Amino acid sequence: MLGGWTLCCRGAGHPPHGGELSQDQVRVSVVIPTHNEAQSIGRVLADLPADTVTEVLVVDSNSTDGTPGIASKMGARILREPRRGYGRACLTGLAEASSPDIVVFLDGDYSDRPAELPFLLAPILDGRADITLGSRLQEPRSAGALPWHQIFGNRLAAGLIRILYRLDISDLGPFRAGRADVLRALALEETTYGWAVEMILKGKLAGFRVVEVPVSYHPRIGKSKISGTLRGTVGAAWFILSLIVRYYFRHRRARNPRTA
């Protein structure tokens, strides 16, 4: 049982943007979007470092396999989000988090390892980053964790971001963390899987520090909802690439209205 999530709540001090966060006072909320993750959610929750995490919010979208019940028994706070969309679930979790200093986003399929969460927190805690991204392409991956078409699509999107935004990243993975004040200042609004890219782009354009951290990656438990097939990857990649270009030109028009 992980009752320690609520018992280890620390002081609610919120230092100004750009300063270091005290390890002893920081409040960390973990948001986990789920849809039929009964096979994996228990392992995800069990592996979260209880001495680091203040609260866990499982945002469930119409699961029919008992996912919310499993998560609730393990101490997670359950948020029901009947509306579809990965981004919508993440936004719901961000909005409902209880006065956090840092918000972590983690999938419920056990492809990322929750025990590696401190790696994402470290650059934020020592004042080097405002948003940290877990890169699955900088560390050795388990065989079959990412098919070639997903690797190609992620590298293509990351390459376009490097060119247009001058942000040196290698991956668009879902395991990430950010200062709560920064994430809320970005006014994120994407309700699809494009939400993860929106965070990166808006963060960079607003002048916040976006830093990558290597994380391991493993075959998910259960079937992918988005990009497990070549067809799904192509559709996701096209949407993400168009989003990257659209935000770039929108920003240029906003800065130079006479040249729009």
Please tell me what each predicted stretch does.
Residues L2-D24, I163-R166, L188-A260:
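Hydrophobic helical membrane-anchoring modules
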Residues P82-R84, R88-E96, P114-Y193, P219-G235, ...:
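Acceptor/aglycone-binding surface of glycosyltransferases and processive sugar-polymer synthases
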Residues D60-P68:
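A conserved acidic beta->alpha catalytic loop
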Residues V53, S99-P100, R128-T132, F208:
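Short, high-confidence coil segments that cap the C-terminus of an alpha-helix
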Residues P100-S111:
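Short beta-strand-to-loop acidic/aromatic patch adjacent to the donor-nucleotide binding site
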Residues H35-A50:
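Short, well-formed alpha-helical segments that are part of the catalytic scaffolds
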Residues E37-S40, S63, Y86, R113:
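Donor nucleotide-sugar binding loop of glycosyltransferases
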Residues R27-S29, E55, E198:
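Cell-envelope/extracellular polymer assembly enzymes that use nucleotide-activated donors
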